[in-house]
Amino acid sequence: RILPYLALIGLAFAEDGLSGWLRYAPLPSSVSWPYIPHNIVVLNTTKTSPVYTAGQELQRGIQSILGQDCHVSSDSTHESIIVGTLDAYVNAYGNLSQTVNLKEDGFWLSTEGNTVQILGQNERGTLYGAFEYLSMLAQGNFSSVAYASNPDAPIRWVNQWDNLDGSIERGFGGASIFFANGSIVDDLTRVAEYARLLASVGINAIVVNNVNANSTILTPDNINGLGRIADTMRPYGVQIGLSLYFASPTQGIKGQANLTTFDPLDSEVVTWWTNVTSQIYDVIPDMAGYLVKANSEGQPGPITYNRTLAEGANLFAKAVQPYGGIVMFRAFVYNQLNESDWKADRANAAVDFFKPLDGEFDDNVVVQIKYGPIDFQVREPASPLFANLRNTSMAVELQVSQEYLGQQTHLVYLPPLWETVLGFDMRVDNETSLVRDILAGRTFERSLGGYAAVVNVGTNQTWLGSHLSMANFYAYGKLAWDPTQDTTKIHEDWTRLTFGLDQVVIDTITQMAVESWPAYENYSGNLGIQTLTDILYTHLGPNPQSQDNNGWGQWTRADHDTIGMDRTVSNGTGFSGTYPPQTAAMYENISTTPDDLLLWFHHVPYTQRLKSGRTVIQHFYDAHYAGAETAQTFAPRWQSLQDKIDDQRFNEQLYRLKYQAGHSIIWRDAIVDFYHNISGIADDYNRVGNHPWRIEAEDMDLNGYKIYTVNPFETASNHHAVITSSNSTVGSISTTLSFPSGKYSIGVNFYDLYGGKSRFEIRVGNMTVGMWKGDSEDYLGHTPSIYLDGHSARRITFGNVEVREG
């Protein structure tokens, strides 16, 4: 009798992250709870209905959390959990005793007395209410509640950047769960599981393919495959949308007519899109709509034919309008620029392209605007376009996928960053105009608007590649529903649902998360200079010089004496003037510009004093050391929880936190060395370029190795590395230690290139301190590098090593 019990315990602790925050873990014995009804009354028994799904979810969750079996029926009994739409409830039982005001997708939840009421404004609202109730139970919260919950905005979408070949652009959690080999996959099990996660946080639609779309998504076979995806997600109230390639009519798509033009005003093109859209809605009658990227980064669009972006958007809007669909039209439109032109500024592009078109978009067009004017940077001002489209519906584009922010190998909790935008006051007409109110349609009285986020889940069992990154996914849904929620509390809730009710676990993981974005900002790019990553290659590691001397417009304009973009009206690009007057005045002047955006708006000497009293360059030095120091604490804090977290998730996340600890030092050294080199200004604390405890590999005795000059230079501490003489060489490097005898931590910087798995061993005296392989591609999903650079650079540390002088 003992062995089966032990087997069950083992299974309970074998977790891989696939359940996300929907683990429904049994409550610990220390938690007591009141009576929970044993009967679930479902007011819609159609198996494709989200109401039916809600009943099944409640039955599953209550059994798992409380160990209580519930009977599901459609008959009214005393002491039941009643699940259905508000209209269905009124038809069955009459009016509620209190007035309930529900918006689209909203729900009413009451646990008062011995009957639980979960009533939605529509069917998916009912499912949202069921997930809310189960979230309470899973967190051990048995409060008596009676309240209505309504989403702040109607659009709460996710964008996947999945390609038909199964790859995912900026995906760091495995291959696509939707596509492979040019078509839709046969097994949609993971798609159903994904829909469940989406519904649990109130996401109502998903665009399943990349904004850099492939026209073959529109073959009849693929349209039928998309229908299978829609059928799979429909029971969870998740509608699907499609990204479109603007020039599709000219691509010779199998099963579709082939035209010689994609001019949006050409009658044949209009007919082509009308017919294709009709085919899609025949298969997917509830398709949410289209997402369009046009005239951006090489993509075709209406400007190709001297048509406006509004005319391009309206082409699709008219096609989906009869079916109730909407068009999300991306504002991410910009051109290559000449850096020698002091007035040139990519940040101006969105306002330049879209403000003149305000009011020309059809009512079912929503302009989808990245949160900042450039591209998902570690800090940007809120896009001024939010304040410039009074007669056009808008949605913000966020990014859960950490493209520029560590690619899920670094712990970075993003909601505090998003808050800086959603809570920003644009001061339109000198009145309070929070971005979140603009998105909800309150400021400009628009009926459409809301949120889109690039999420990019994949086949990895953790969905995003990292257990802790799932907090960003969860929090996105929660903030899209209610952007006023406290982001620390959101993380605490997520931690309870993901790792259990131990308060030490909750406090430790949440505090790490709260510190993570400031730490990443500190060791990547501060004062509004943007994320100083390699914008020309992987977007992962440091390479500040890649920002300048090209046409991409993410310039820092750093030289020997000065740094930053002058975006003032008086002397610069005029970007500050694209904001409403009060906000423009704040950003126009150095004295009123917040320090954390100083270099975004102003070109200043490195010796410019901040409000803290420090110079810009000293702040760079101090911040990078402080950020990396914080990152060193994450792995030890996580290790303190070892006996409180299952082994698999514990070890998988520990690997990433140790990687982050090493990579943050690589970031720190690269950035401070670069700016020390370019400015010639010393660090007040003599840290930069001064490493008395460091041994340079090129100064050691080399056997089978040769010296190699690294590019960019700052990704090696003395600008050089050593590499084996050939790929088949087994080599060694050695030195005699002159440090005082004692116990040390020894850190080794090395390069882990994609395409090979070198083996390493470090010995002190006759003792092997450690052995490892350059095999991070087996554990990390970040974009790899084939070069010795800031992306392939790693650092591994061995602690408590006995060292004898000599």
Residue ranges and their predicted role:
Residues 1-14:
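Fungal secretory targeting signals
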Residues 13-113, 143-144:
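Acidic, contiguous N-terminal accessory segments
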Residues 31-49, 175-179, 209-212, 596, ...:
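Acidic/histidine-rich, surface-exposed loop or edge segments in extracytoplasmic proteins
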Residues 49, 54-57, 61, 96-291, ...:
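Feature activates predominantly on carbohydrate-active enzymes
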Residues 90, 181-184, 257-492, 498, ...:
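Catalytic-core regions of glycoside hydrolase
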Residues 685-806:
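Extracytoplasmic
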